[in-house]
């Protein structure tokens, strides 16, 4: 779990749209559980979803996690979305944590099942403590500037 724990950027690609999520993978040694928690932003850096991952299965030999997630979209906060996600991490340098990964998640819309989508994702680790602090505690304008900058540089 130590290979993947930490703060991550996730580029989310769907036909005609790209967005970004900033999230954290936490490992609780006492309960031996992994949790994910993040916020997604559109291409303009506006927040559009909050989500958390649970029931995370780590498959160490494949550098892979599979998880269930639940969340809300800001425009339909009364509607709960959920799904399953999977991420495979690129092999890290010796003695280093993973730095990149890729995968997909399924965004299930129970109110309109025909809108359920599979979304491809790419991950890159964020190790700059200042960026992490700004994303977790900074002003909305700071988060917007960071998300658009990271997405444009991807």
Where do the PLM segments sit?
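Central antiparallel beta-sheet cores of small beta-barrel/beta-sandwich binding domains
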Residues: 2-154
